[in-house]
């Protein structure tokens, strides 16, 4: 594929694959095909890990032709193909070029992150009177579960029935002591690409020993298209009156503070880059946005509107709904041009943004934060939905 890619003048195999898909769609139309087709789930070999495990790539396509691709390695979402207001399709998920890149490069691109997403301060926590010393992989802290966490594992993938689209369930059993966390953790994550053009992510997690957990998906979005440049002019709304302030090493202080009067106030649509260079101390600490927003939730764990992102140029919209209490907005501050993405371009700060639905960072060390403890006999359930559209009305904001 590499030689053919160069011969035809494409910058990457992903670009060439999308070109072939467009040609196939045109051929279907010429032969009398229609725009809508039955939802499908296909898979093909993708490569072999450094540890010798075979990895497959899965392609989900809904009735309207919306397409998502993911790997059995880390559950990595490599591609989300979404039309703009004129019907032009672009991949809006940042990705990497090869399996080896996903194994070795930083950034957690598109991956399922756990056993504990985000940071645990000092790489330790105390549970039931016992202190667990984790593996520090972010300065003195533990980030996204450790250096060899669930985003670096091969998951079992099974097709799943979905009345409203196409679905697959990814399963992994993390042994007791994995990355020094207690308990054998059984995790099932179901990706559903619905026929109303949404990606639904459902988590189901159980343990055989008291432990702590936090799960999210670490996809970077660029609504103008992967490799199109900065998202600074794309607009964002976050349904949050409060956030959790951080220390210089990005650990929550334990305070829950109002966003009003700060650059973290996204309660109305605002360009992501409008206040990115603010001298506000929180922005200086994170070199941009890397903050946990406390969502304005309804009663209980109800699925509520969390955030909207919009690209005025293309008209593409993502609306995010979740049962989680918070969302981490991250503006890819760690990207410095050293990583070449699947688009063939180098990734830099503001090349993409994340909407990482989650419990609060460092909750095991902050008793005033919502608990992340999980006990035997309990099953943790969480749902996040990313709905894709163009120029759509804003959902109502629950209070």
Where are these regions (language model features)?
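Bacterial N-terminal signal peptides
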Residues: 19-31
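N-terminal secretory signal peptides that target proteins for export/translocation
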Residues: 1-15
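Sec/Tat signal peptide C-region and signal peptidase I cleavage site
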Residues: 33-37
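Compositionally biased regions
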Residues: 13-14, 32, 397
């Amino acid at each position: 594929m590499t030689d053919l890619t160069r011969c035809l003048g494409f910058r990457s195999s992903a670009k060439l694959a999308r070109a072939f898909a467009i040609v196939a769609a045109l051929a279907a139309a010429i032969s009398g095909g229609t725009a809508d087709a039955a939802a499908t789930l296909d898979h093909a070999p993708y490569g072999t890990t450094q540890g010798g495990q075979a990895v497959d790539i899965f392609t989900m396509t809904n009735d309207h032709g919306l397409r998502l691709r993911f790997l059995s390695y880390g559950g990595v979402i490599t591609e989300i193909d979404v039309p703009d207001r004129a019907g032009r399709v672009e991949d809006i998920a940042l990705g990497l070029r090869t399996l080896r890149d996903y194994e070795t490069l930083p950034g957690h691109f598109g991956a399922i992150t756990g056993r504990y997403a985000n940071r645990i301060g000092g790489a330790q926590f105390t549970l039931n009177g016992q202190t667990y010393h984790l593996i520090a992989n972010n300065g003195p802290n533990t980030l996204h579960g450790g250096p060899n966490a669930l985003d670096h594992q091969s998951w079992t993938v099974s097709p799943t029935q979905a009345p409203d689209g196409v679905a697959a369930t990814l399963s992994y059993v993390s042994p007791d002591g994995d990355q020094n966390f207690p308990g054998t953790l059984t995790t099932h994550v179901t990706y559903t690409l619905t026929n109303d053009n949404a990606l639904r992510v459902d988590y189901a997690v159980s343990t055989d020993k008291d432990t702590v957990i936090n799960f999210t998906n670490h996809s970077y979005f660029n609504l103008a298209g992967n490799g199109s440049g900065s998202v600074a002019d794309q607009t964002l709304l976050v349904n949050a009156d409060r956030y959790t302030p951080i220390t210089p090493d990005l650990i929550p202080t334990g305070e829950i503070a109002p966003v009003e009067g700060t650059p973290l106030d996204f309660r109305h649509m605002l360009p992501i880059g409008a206040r990115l260079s603010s001298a506000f101390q929180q922005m200086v600490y994170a070199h941009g946005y890397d903050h946990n927003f406390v969502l304005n939730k309804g009663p209980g764990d109800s699925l509520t509107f969390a955030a909207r992102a919009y690209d005025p140029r293309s008209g593409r919209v993502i609306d995010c709904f979740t049962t989680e209490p918070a969302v981490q907005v991250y503006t890819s501050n760690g990207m410095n041009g050293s990583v070449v993405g699947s688009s063939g371009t180098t990734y830099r700060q503001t090349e993409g943004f994340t909407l990482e639905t989650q419990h609060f960072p460092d909750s095991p060390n902050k008793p005033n934060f919502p608990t992340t403890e999980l006990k035997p006999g309990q099953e943790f359930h969480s749902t996040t939905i990313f709905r894709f559209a163009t120029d759509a009305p804003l959902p109502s904001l629950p209070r």
